[in-house]
Amino acid sequence: MENSTPKKISESQIKNLALSGGGFYGFAVVGALKEIFDNYIDPNNIKTISGVSVGSIIATMLAIGYSIDEITKIMFEIDMDTLIKDSYFSYYTLWEKFGMYNADKLEQEIERIIRDKTHIKNCTFSQIEKNLIIVTTNLNYQRTRIFSKLETPTMIISKAVRMSISYPFIMVPVLFEGDLYGDGGETLNYPITLFDDDLDKTIGITFANHNENDDGTLKTRLPINNFYDYIVSLGLTMNRSSYISQISSKYLDRSIVIKINEDISSMQFNLDLKQKEYLFECGIKSVKQQIIKLINH
């Protein structure tokens, strides 16, 4: 049953926010945050924000001072499909650069969004007030790499975000300090685990689509009919395996699990406005249904 009378969560209760990877399900994250910040939590009380993949984009906007209404506007106006597919697909790019698209325009857009709010070109982690944590994967060492004010103060934020969103095979991985970096979800798709020492003051947002259980396992067989389906399935398998290995009841108890009941893939390009609005509403509805467990914790 939905919580019909919103009750604010006190400043002392919540100070950490963890946003999982989820591709185009990012619209649902924004909907969830809209409901949370409008009715339950003052966003100024959030001190540390961690994000993976699309979660890293939203986490960054929150950390540098965008309001949830501003973030909603940006997410609905930005053309992710065009920004990611900024070049013609060729097998040469996939073979030589390990991805279908360079996505340079997407990185430039992320940099513009950051610069517009901070008024700083190539803004680094040390130049913002909140503690922003961006999760990436070092492909050469096959391990998680964290970028934050504490660990990498001089790192350019837009570059770290570009690494974190480098979905396998779709986007070219990023060469940094001699190593290749890819989607953070390949090794850590839900960064709530970074808050083990402060879990009772943390809220995480993650997903379960119509074919998933809350723990990330699939309910039914996923069809693979062409090369693109195969690539997407391979990427989702890596993200799912990292998620399943990390999730447990103690994390689910601190999580809003957004239910996506329509047949919309997290990697479905060319979402129309109706689909974006549906995902946004899924986020709002899931918070209304689940926030009570966090209030009563």
Swiss-Prot record:
Localization: Membrane
Q: Where is this motif: GXSXG?
A: 51-55
Q: Which GO terms describe its biological process?
A: lipid catabolic process
Positions of short motif DGA/G: 183-185
InterPro entries from the entry? Acyl_Trfase/lysoPLipase, Lipid_Hydrolase, PNPLA_dom
Origin, by domain of life?
Viruses
Q: Coiled coil: which residue ranges?
A: none
Q: Entry's Pfam families?
A: Patatin
Q: Name one GO cellular component term.
A: membrane
Motif (GXGXXG) on chain: 21-26
* EC code(s) of this entry: 3.1.1.-
Annotated membrane topology is: Multi-pass membrane protein
What does the UniProt keyword field contain? Glycoprotein, Hydrolase, Lipid degradation, Lipid metabolism, Membrane, Transmembrane, Transmembrane helix
UniProt-listed PROSITE patterns: PNPLA
Instruction: Give the PNPLA domain ranges.
Output: 17-196
Which residues catalyse the reaction? S53, D183
Could you cite one Gene Ontology molecular function of this protein? hydrolase activity
Ranges annotated as spanning the membrane: 17-37, 48-68
Q: Glycosylation positions?
A: N122, N239
Job of this protein: Probable lipid hydrolase.
- This chain's protein is named Uncharacterized protein R571
